Design a protein with these regions (language model features):
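N-terminal non-catalytic structural scaffold regions of very large proteins
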Residues: 1-265
Length: 268
């Protein structure tokens, strides 16, 4: 392997005595590039190529979900937020055979929660936005059946946050402080969540909104606009997206791949 060793001068402190010791630490071998732009790994010449990956942003898709017991089809319309770094959030409008239309969301790929619980957790409850959900349901009347059932479930923002926490971390005792911290860290903390400038531009274009490109975390208005488009699609208004279209893909360059490796090294 054509490489060079990496050594780091490290300083260690004894927590009990306060003694400080400095020494050189071997961190590993770093592959070296040849003058032809290739690498030699275990005697084999290799090259790093760019990757075609899903672009960050929001994607609206139709679909069908099957229940394994009776293989009955559930008609779906989904709106999924794909960040550059962080947890996905998937919202859906579902039509079960012979039952009311329901809208829900999966936060951090956990169990499905009611869409009304998510909206209340974002601050669209009676205390912060009086009458908002009633007006929302009047506009999308096919959700009236679900609204009548969910009206009294986690009716405040605090109770909605606790409900999401219990779904995401079953078995752990929920407190309002930990529930708020978890919800914020998932989508509204720049250290854990990054939509990227490209993702923000694509989301602005898809949602027909104007938000600064440097706003790389989610806003509650983003989620609300996604919900509105998703239920519009269920009502027959608007167009779905083609996930395989090249407009929904991007090139991950060699420089970005190396950047991610350096970031991993820094975190160590």
């Amino acid at each position: 392997t054509y490489s060079a060793p990496i050594f780091v001068r490290a300083r260690f402190m004894n927590a009990n005595t306060g003694e400080i010791k400095e020494q050189t630490v071997f961190m590993g071998d770093f592959p070296m590039m040849t003058d032809k732009g290739t690498f030699i790994i275990n005697g084999t010449e290799r090259v790093v190529v760019s990757q075609l990956v899903r672009s960050p942003g929001v994607i609206f898709q139709p679909g069908e979900r099957f229940r394994l017991r009776n293989l009955s089809k559930h008609q779906l319309v989904t709106g999924t937020i794909h960040p550059y770094r962080g947890e996905w959030i998937e919202m859906d409008v579902e039509q079960k055979p012979g039952k009311d239309v329901t809208a829900g969301a999966r936060v951090a790929r956990k169990r499905r929660i009611s869409l009304f619980t998510l909206l209340r957790a974002l601050g669209y409850d009676e205390e912060n936005e009086p009458g908002f959900l009633d007006r929302f349901v009047q506009h999308f009347d096919f959700l009236e059946g679900q609204w009548e059932k969910d009206r009294e479930i986690a009716p405040t923002q605090e109770e909605a946050l606790l409900e999401i926490y219990k779904r995401a971390r079953p078995g752990e005792p929920p407190t309002l402080e930990t529930a708020e911290a978890m919800f914020k860290s998932l989508f509204f903390d720049s250290e854990r969540y990054d939509l990227s400038a490209v993702g923000r531009v694509k989301m602005n274009s898809r949602l027909n909104q104007e938000t600064d490109d440097q706003m790389r975390i989610l806003r509650k208005e983003d989620i609300l606009n996604i919900v509105k488009i998703m239920v519009d699609l269920k009502d027959g208004r608007g167009e779905i997206d083609d996930i395989d279209h090249l407009g929904n893909r991007r090139v991950r360059s060699v420089g970005e791949l190396l950047e991610n490796q350096y970031l991993s090294l820094i975190h160590i």
